[in-house]
Amino acid sequence: MRPSNALITPEGYPFIAYSAGLFLFLAGGAVLLKSVALAVPAAVTLLLVLFVISFFRNPERMPPADTALLVAPADGTVVYVGPATQEHLGACQKISIFMSVFNVHVNRAPISGTVVDRFYKQGKFYDARHADASCENEQCGLVMEQDNGVRVAFVQIAGLIARRILCYAEVGDRLERGQRYGMIRFGSRVDVYLPEGLESLVTVGQTTVAGETALVRLG
């Protein structure tokens, strides 16, 4: 497991370095040459630097005290709540969360337990807000089992802009609820598959906070 507790994820360091270097080059040229033509792109590049820093932010999160609550694995907006079929769980419930480029993109474990399966599927890069993204897009998923035997699957899905899924958890790893386990660059979706019969605590259109927003109560 590689996830860091740093305020900025290490995955963002190269992007920050490149954009900051470009800004310094343009800003330095604008000052030395007294060039408005360089000052304008320098200002635009500074905005890019700030955006990149914001995208790779990695804030601390505090899961709810009630350990029976399954929490959101991603920041974003709920785009689907309803029945589904998942190859590892069979008939189940699904809650889908869409992450825009302005959301925190660090993903967190929704429950405490052991990773019992990991799967990857190559695919398309459709808009992650669309239902077809769950089946057609590139994705990486984990199946976790709680100590009481309850299993939950959650799947990182690439989107129209997001083209890189990072998942550091492996089969056999023990994850705690709210623990960082990966991220997706740059705008994407996470689907959570749950046992049937659970009452959803969120609705379509609701905003979620990874590691804090309760999606359902397990048991």
UniProtKB/Swiss-Prot annotation:
Record GO terms (molecular function): phosphatidylserine decarboxylase activity
Protein name: Phosphatidylserine decarboxylase proenzyme
Topology in membrane: Peripheral membrane protein
Modified residues (Pyruvic acid (Ser)): S188
GO biological process: phosphatidylethanolamine biosynthetic process
Pfam families noted in UniProt: PS_Dcarbxylase
Job of this protein: Catalyzes the formation of phosphatidylethanolamine (PtdEtn) from phosphatidylserine (PtdSer).
Highest taxon listed in the record's lineage: Bacteria
Top enzyme class: lyase
GO cellular component, one term: plasma membrane
This protein's encoding gene: psd
Site features described as Cleavage (non-hydrolytic), chain residue numbers: G187, S188
Free-text cofactor note: Binds 1 pyruvoyl group covalently per subunit.
Record's subunit section: Heterodimer of a large membrane-associated beta subunit and a small pyruvoyl-containing alpha subunit.
Entry PTM: Is synthesized initially as an inactive proenzyme. Formation of the active enzyme involves a self-maturation process in which the active site pyruvoyl group is generated from an internal serine residue via an autocatalytic post-translational modification. Two non-identical subunits are generated from the proenzyme in this reaction, and the pyruvate is formed at the N-terminus of the alpha chain, which is derived from the carboxyl end of the proenzyme.
Enzyme nomenclature, EC number: 4.1.1.65
Family listed: Belongs to the phosphatidylserine decarboxylase family. PSD-A subfamily.
